[in-house]
Every structure is written in structure tokens, then in C-alpha cells.
């Protein structure tokens, strides 16, 4: 479990101070985000729960659960903790399972169990990451908002606070490449079909089952806005993509002096589906990064954490340690030039097929 009831003495003393401070504070306003979640999951019992945000002064996330006046009261230091507390009650007291499938019915007891004593649970770790690039290529390409809404609820219920959020990036890349001189058909043909986009994003394959429809790009852009807004509302920090060096082959025509090379073949795909990479030491790299991140931030906002994997299951143009070190340095510097608070998260699936 991501949360533990074994609080340290320091935590217990801090919690006592918080409880004392609650007695001197005004009544907290109803937590709309959590009420809305209850209405989505089990509307018939929504009125049986109350949620209260506690001062966020402890080192770790925490929640408390208690029965007060025939209601279940859940307190926590943020909405993510409140959601995790709700799931703890559902799982261990109601014996209720909430799946991430929107069509799965949630079976609740007719009478909600009463807690005899108040319980307090502390998170075991601060950052609780979920998803990887490949998961966005199974059924997710065809998900509607209703599907995502349920998954985001599930993530919050299970304590996830750092989800990968890479939907909708092609809409931004479309604008970037078009501004740099590529034609509509070139750009949409450079993308793969929806089911293979994760491997396109990881620089494994281009052009496969393309062109990508403009309508799909627009719908995914709107969907990503809904996704990151809801994730933030529920106390999460979405991990957005940034530029890794993967470029369309056609960019070489417009920028003949750019240090663009072809990546190795991947997964048995024909030569014509190989991807291309621009050296991060080329000045054009930083310009592309800046253009992309500024557009992404304007559209989706930022929490200053970005996912980049430059050589996922493909060969680096050069395996020299100094080259790889310089590539990493230049990639991070290009992000930092746009976002001085940037953090880089990497999956490290650095194996060659």
C-alpha cells in the first residue's frame, strides 16, 4: 500500500497541533471536487460523506476517517489524500471495489459501516507515479471523456499524484511543424495512426497507418485539456511531454544544414518507417523545444515536470559516454531555458530490439 497507519512520533505531535487548530478555525466550505466524485461513483450515498481539507503542514500526505452524526467524515491535506481516504473506507469497511472501467457498476452496502474509532493514515512516499508511454496505445486512443473521467477518479482513489499526461500532443506538434514550413499532408503523414502513436512519440516508428485525421487532432487537444484540468483538481501533477529530438524527415529539406540523422530500425518495420533525430547540440533543437513548450504551456498549463526518453529501444547516433552526457545536458538546458523550474522524468526503457 502507498499509505501506512504507522505514523512517527513527530507526525503524531504535528497531527495533534492540527487537531487543536481545527477547534479554533471556522467551518470549512464543502469540498465540491470530492462531492462531485461521490455523485459520479455512488450518487445514492453521496450525502453520507463529508470532506474537509486540513492544513498542509505535515511532511507526508495523510488522511483521517471518522464517523460523526451518521456521516463518514474524511479529512486530508489535499484532494488526492481525501480521495485516497475515501477509497480506504470503501475497500476496507464497505468491501467495495472501484474499477477504472466507466461501465463497471459499483456495489455499495445498503447501510454504510460506522467507524468506532478515528483512523489516521500517512503516505509512504511523496511522489506516486502512474502510466507509461505504451499504455496510451492500447484502448486509450479511442477513449472518450467518460472513460478518462473514471480512470482519473480511480487514480485519485488509489493515491496516484503524478500521472503521465501525453494525450493531445500531436495537435501542438502539428502547429509547430507547420510554422516551420512543413505542409499539412507531410505532417499528418509523419504521425502514425492512433494505435501506434506511443511508439511514434518514443521515436520508434513514423508514417505507419497514416495520415492522422485533422478531426482526431482537434478532438484529442480538447480531451487533453479536460484530462489535465481534472487531474489538477484532484491534487495531481500531470507529467507533460517535451521535445526529445524526434523530427520529421522532411525537415531536412527546409533546414539542409541541420544535424539530422536517421535512427536505427525498430521492431521489424521496413526501412521507410525509420524515424529521424536532430542533434541537441544543433541550435535548431533549442528553437524547436522553445516553440513546443510555449505552445503546450499556453494550451495545457504546466506543473514543471516533463517526460522525455530520447533513445527508447533504438540506437543512439553515438554511444560515446561524452556524447550521451552532452545530449542529456543539452536536452535539459533546452527545457530550462523555457521553464526555469523544470524537472525531467525518464522511463529508461533503453533496450534495443
For each predicted feature, which ranges?
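Bacterial Sec-dependent N-terminal signal peptides
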Residues: 8-30
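Aromatic-lined carbohydrate-binding surfaces of glycoside hydrolases
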Residues: 45, 54-59, 64, 68-80, ...
